[in-house]
Amino acid sequence: MSFSECPLVISACKKFLQKRITIENEALINALITALAQTNTLNDLCLLPIQTYLLSYKNAFEWIHFVCIAITTILDSKYNWKDCTVDINYIFLHVTYIYTIKTKEYLDYCS
């Protein structure tokens, strides 16, 4: 999915994330909001921490968690995603593999 093909993604993500800023996650969410404008695909967005700076497993979990929740929330909205198919499961598996994080660990973190 390209953000340029679905122009509401960036603004919707920003609104979703800004409502969830806390003292603990402020830096992470602000980095994610900034990254939205600099990436073209959801996959790029998830992999951005690898390309820019190293994150601990905990931060990597949180980053992927925020990205996927934001996108999933948007997919549940009334916006027509006919031409913007996102395979969330693929993103989970692909990114957790790159971070060498076991899927079970990620699911435990999210539960």
From Swiss-Prot:
Task: Spell out the family assignment given in the record's similarity comment.
Answer: Belongs to the asfivirus E111R family.
How is this protein named in the record? Answer: Uncharacterized protein E111R
